[in-house]
Amino acid sequence: MAAKDVKFGNDARIKMLRGVNILADAVKVTLGPKGRNVVLDKSFGSPTITKDGVSVAREIELEDKFENMGAQMVKEVASKANDAAGDGTTTATVLAQSIITEGLKAVAAGMNPMDLKRGIDKAVIAAVEELKKLSVPCSDSKAIAQVGTISANSDSTVGELIAQAMEKVGKEGVITVEEGSGLQDELDVVEGMQFDRGYLSPYFINKPETGSIELESPFILLADKKISNIREMLPVLEAVAKAGKPLLIIAEDVEGEALATLVVNTMRGIVKVAAVKAPGFGDRRKAMLQDIATLTAGTVISEEIGLELEKTTLEDLGQAKRVVINKDTTIIIDGVGDEAAIQGRVAQIRQQIEDATSDYDKEKLQERVAKLAGGVAVIKVGAATEVEMKEKKARVEDALHATRAAVEEGVVAGGGVALIRAAHAIAGLKGDNEDQNVGIKVALRAMESPLRQIVVNAGEEASVIANKVKAGEGSFGYNAYTEEYGDMIAMGILDPTKVTRSALQYAASIAGLMITTECMVTDLPRDDKGADMGAGGMGGMGGMM
């Protein structure tokens, strides 16, 4: 086991604080509308330019092991805030730095660290309650666009795009961000249920100019099995041909004789058919087939529940207004499913989301909800160069997380004002002893730090502006972008309550632990030179063979 380097008391805390400051100083230059970019060197490819706090934090590793421990703990603050709300990472880092700096000063002055931590925790619990009182619901497109704009570094086109996307697919809909091919940002909305499976044979194509298949008012056969024998399909095909409608077959697979016969029938115009594989694998495939069945008012033909293909009738088939199939995707538009049944299915999947433990499962279930409930919107980010594209895509993703958080828990006045109002409301809070009172003061002072940092980044005098904002009431604050005072909510400067709350809670949680640190232990650096000499001495062993 390697020898350890151990530091105690003030020595340990000074080292830790130095690491905290290096990381926080690198992150906090990005805060606010006039925050700057940080350039990150990559071991391969071109450097990345970012204004995203958590991206900067993740890149920082320090040479000194004790300083690095301090930096890594603050990195954890940024990561936790990012995981919880998807934004607010820089705010969380600034809050943590302030609590740690002020807290360690109090420890050096002889206060009890445990009571300081209790005081900080009391203040944060009270402040979170105040934030909830200050919060207003975020329901209309205008507010959503404003939240998106602020989070995307005052880029109003991004805010507008996100608001449009949410309007089209609903607040629960899936919105994804992709790299576009042009210079302009674009919004693509896929109405209806889309899944990533294309046609099984190009001979089904009936729109050669687009290389796709379009079926108007088709019947939809859903089979949870491989279909290779045409005989078991004949009754259904005959019934569909009599009805004079096209047929879409969604099955585990359609192969061999069955596929060949379907192709021949289609080419001769006897019956218009298209076949695609069912989406997903294993249990997820069964669930998605059931989703399609609910959407189209059909029945999944599965031997598990005693249904056979030979005995399938038109009543078992689903229906939709239109189906479009190309090489890679199938879109079912306007299924005839009963609205109540669809909502019931959505509620069932939502319950599974609550119970899901892995992020991957949650994401897949969320996609299923969106496909049933509204549709999928894709924001395609446009830029002139790859470096700009990556930076912009990261900003759009941040803005999207922020708007989702705003819809979830509402919004408060932005620009650090909400924290100042919350701090003012709990200024009379008292702890059980004097040390706890100092802890409360540390937290209250820290709650001013995001506003101060926004002002510093805008090149103004922090104390003057902070005092003027503190003297105001409600959502009165300072707009660093236009350099004027006013009602932040009226000016459209909004922060999601969830983002502000998460930033404060995670910053206080980790900063409180760091204040109570009395000893730090790390591995001593190994003397590689000595190790090499030892290994070199073994060279003579070869002669022993």
UniProtKB/Swiss-Prot annotation:
GO annotation, cellular component aspect: cytoplasm
Gene Ontology molecular function, alphabetical: ATP binding; ATP-dependent protein folding chaperone; isomerase activity; unfolded protein binding
InterPro entries, per the entry: Chaperonin_Cpn60_CS, Cpn60/GroEL, Cpn60/GroEL/TCP-1, GroEL-like_apical_dom_sf, GROEL-like_equatorial_sf, TCP-1-like_intermed_sf
CDD domains recorded: GroEL (cd03344)
Binding site for ATP: T30, L31, G32, P33, K51, D87, G88, T89, T90, T91, G415, D495
Catalysis: reaction(s): ATP + H2O + a folded polypeptide = ADP + phosphate + an unfolded polypeptide
One GO process term, biological-process aspect: protein refolding
Localization: Cytoplasm
Pfam families: Cpn60_TCP1
Chaperone keyword on record: yes
EC number, as in UniProt: 5.6.1.7
Major localisation: cytoplasm
PROSITE patterns: CHAPERONINS_CPN60 (PS00296)
Keywords (A to Z) from UniProt: ATP-binding, Chaperone, Cytoplasm, Isomerase, Nucleotide-binding
Family note: Belongs to the chaperonin (HSP60) family.
Subunit-structure text: Forms a cylinder of 14 subunits composed of two heptameric rings stacked back-to-back. Interacts with the co-chaperonin GroES.
PANTHER family hit by this protein: 60 KDA HEAT SHOCK PROTEIN, MITOCHONDRIAL
Primary role: Together with its co-chaperonin GroES, plays an essential role in assisting protein folding. The GroEL-GroES system forms a nano-cage that allows encapsulation of the non-native substrate proteins and provides a physical environment optimized to promote and accelerate protein folding.
Protein name: Chaperonin GroEL
Organism: Yersinia pestis bv. Antiqua (strain Antiqua)
